[in-house]
Amino acid sequence: MYKNIDDIRQEFLNFFKKKGHKIISSSTLIPNSDQTLLFTNSGMNQFKNIFLGIDKPLFKRVATAQRCVRAGGKHNDLNNVGYTERHLTFFEMLGNFSFGDYFKNEAIQFAWELLTDVNWFNLSKNKLWVTVHNCDGESYDIWSNQIDIPNEHIVKIGSNTNDFCDSDNFWQMGNIGPCGPCSEIFYDRGDRFQGGPPGSLEEFGERYVEIWNLVFIQFDRQENGRLLSLPMLSVDTGMGLERITSILQGVNSNFSIDVFKKLISSISRIMKINDIYINRSVYVIADHIRACSFLIQDGVLPANEGRGYVLRRIIRRAILHGKKLGVNDIFFYKLVSPLIKYMQHIADILHEKKDFIAEILLSEEKLFQDTLKRGLELLEKQLIRLKGNCLNGEIAFNLYDTYGFPFELTQDVCLKRGIHVDQEGFDQAMLTQKKYTKELNKFDISYEKLSLCNVSSIFVGYDKLICKSRVMALFQNNKSINKIYTKEEGIVILNNTPFYGESGGQIGDCGQLNTISGFFQVSNTKKYGQTIGHLGIVNSGTISVGEEIVAQVDQHKRKCISLNHSATHLLRAALSQVLGSHVTQKGSLVNDRYLRFDFYHHATMTTTQMNTVENIVNEQIWKNAPITVDVMPIELARNSGAVILINKQYDKKVRVLKIGNFSTELCGGTHAEHTGEIGVFMITKECSIAAGIRRVEAVTNNVALSAIHQYKMLLKNIFQSTQSDDKNILSKIHEFKCRYQKLEKEIDTLRNQQIIQQSLSFIKDVYYIKDVRILVKQVVNMTSKTLFNMTDCIKHQLKSGVIVLINLNTNKKINLVVAVTKDLIERNRINALSLVHYIIKILGGKGGGRPDFAQAGINNMATTSKISIEVNSLLHNIL
């Protein structure tokens, strides 16, 4: 009986539900408790802390259908998608898990029953092969004696090296920690496919397909490589839904299963393509729209780093494959609707964000179109200057690295012109860049350490702004010292301090440190691991290690910072209300003068949206709501609904900041006690800082009041200057604008008349080389627009000929404009671009353009008369 993909998923879950398993929903594609992963890439990710012994399992038996993405980091299938029948960036992983309950025997029995029983998947037993680790005799015996699978269908896989764990049939989470042997189940697709059984020399063919991996977690690997037995034996299995669907539906490819067939059919209709099953670009697009839509749904937005960068790569890869299919119009966002239609089982998740997902994809596609246009223009300039038929790899890398222009597109453009691209040079430039980035990171780490980690500082500044302390260490120029003298700068480390160290976007405190022997002015405070460093200068006396000290924070500055920090939390919550739940923090700055908040959003905020956000924040301020802090375990905070930054590492216990019933977030910063202390909130700026990332700047309290006064004064000056008031200021500005535009038109008319007259006067200087009319003329201080208009006017008068205008600017820079009429180009006599290239070769400089019009800047500071002679000589040689 035919089963669609939804039937197969549900059948898997129903089977394990009958076997006493709790069915757990898929987690998001952003791992909540594992910052080492870019994306959720397997079913076990959400249970990792259980396997590590950090969390206790709520259920002993669990089964899931987990959404996964493998498009970055260790598990990256992105470049394989579309070129193999199996690889996908987005897929679902079916899995059953046991946490200290059943082990190998039951896991193998369950797998065999589901796969072969007539009431379930009903696969032929003769088609199934299994592999086991060659030292896992227990699994081998179960397969051989209890399942009664033929011994020739059981393959023992050894280690690749002398290391027992270095085997395809041994799973480990990392170099240390939980691990164990695994048993993989393969399906034989028949002799119409090439390839041999697993473990053979021909195993990499298409005939034998791995469909299920059963991992038996029984060891704890130590740093020295020893394997200790775990007290709790666990099972972790994974079976790709799309792959098992292809087997059960009797098709040869993941892209031929029901959900992909429907999606690909819609893609072909929307993109107006034929032969969809011949061109693999369609496979790429079908896979990528799934990955992109679910990533955006789970909170990932296009960016220049991290998860957002991977998403941007996937989007752009899909667009490039669209271009390979001859589709140059914007199309990708249109595929969201059919995707939702055909993925019914999770359509509800996507449907509520359908418009938002489409908007993000449309915005990113438009941005990439601009990138491609700019990149093609830059590439064209490089190809014009090219000597020979090989484009330097560094140039191709610069286009890729600086302008985001894809290397494969550079190759395509060059290939059409018979130009080779230096792949080796590109790869070398990429390697150099990676090494440079690595070195920068190394520098950051070494600076962070500063050997300060030997001293832990206790922060007491939540409750007090002045306290007694002791100098534990002093640093100068990254070196530990015992004393700092008058007018010397340094870093002071205390055993406890009221000074807040710069972190979480909040700047460090300022203030003073007083001892019997000296006075230290603190200009900034920074955190170095568990150490808090006070940066500043000794204003008088000396500061020595071991001295008792009185540490006093600048109270006014701290108060302003705290007000702005609380306002930032109100701003974030208000932005989420107005713009949508996708608003997540990308960065922030909180100081005593203003606050800055960077967040994911795809469009410029409208005036109405900004006013609404302002009003919401001010309403919360005027409520004078209490601001409270609770310290709790991270898991409890997560379950409470507190906003948690995905990419940030947190301690086991965290501070949860609650502002009335309006905002709940994790925060280690300092805050007001009530919102009323903030006084007033005003947005001063909203802008883009990167594709998909917006920035809002705002002020509060007295700074906001000062800003209002400044705006009032500015408005008063405008009224006086325009002789208007608040009732007619807009009409006055409109009147001035119309008058200005009218004068501009009159000036343009006069300028054009002058150009025509001057052009007519030039005609008398036309001369012939052979039968071609030539005009070479020197002009002074003309703008590019005037030069273009004059050239156009002379062309119109000449009808046929070559025009060269040599323009000398007041800064003594020379630029040329060359124009050639259409008839001469068609007769292959000459073209403007070739002429400019000849001139640049002799006189030096840079230039470019079209066959009918080109221009150049001349580096050589020769006189214009000399240039005229060279140009004339060139024309004689060419013609």
Swiss-Prot record:
- PANTHER family, A to Z: ALANINE--TRNA LIGASE, CYTOPLASMIC, ALANYL-TRNA SYNTHETASE
Q: Give the UniProt keywords, A-Z.
A: Aminoacyl-tRNA synthetase, ATP-binding, Cytoplasm, Ligase, Metal-binding, Nucleotide-binding, Protein biosynthesis, RNA-binding, tRNA-binding, Zinc
The record's NCBIfam families line, in alphabetical order, gives: alaS (TIGR00344)
Query: Which Pfam family would be a valid example here?
Result: tRNA_SAD
What InterPro entries does the annotation carry?
A: aa-tRNA-synth_II/BPL/LPL (IPR045864), Ala-tRNA-lgiase_IIc (IPR002318), Ala-tRNA-ligase_IIc_anticod-bd (IPR018162), Ala-tRNA-synth_IIc_core (IPR018165), Ala-tRNA-synth_IIc_N (IPR018164), Ala-tRNA_ligase (IPR050058), Ala_tRNA_ligase_euk/bac (IPR023033), DHHA1_dom (IPR003156)
Q: Where is this chain's protein located in or outside the cell?
A: Cytoplasm
Gene that specifies this protein: alaS
> Which species does the entry assign this protein to?
Blochmanniella pennsylvanica (strain BPEN)
The cofactor note from the UniProt entry for this protein is: Binds 1 zinc ion per subunit.
Which GO BP terms apply? alanyl-tRNA aminoacylation; negative regulation of DNA-templated transcription
Provide the E.C. number(s) assigned to this enzyme. 6.1.1.7
UniProt protein name: Alanine--tRNA ligase
UniProt lists the family membership as follows:
Belongs to the class-II aminoacyl-tRNA synthetase family.
GO cellular component terms, semicolon-separated: cytosol
Q: What is the lineage of its organism?
A: Bacteria, Pseudomonadati, Pseudomonadota, Gammaproteobacteria, Enterobacterales
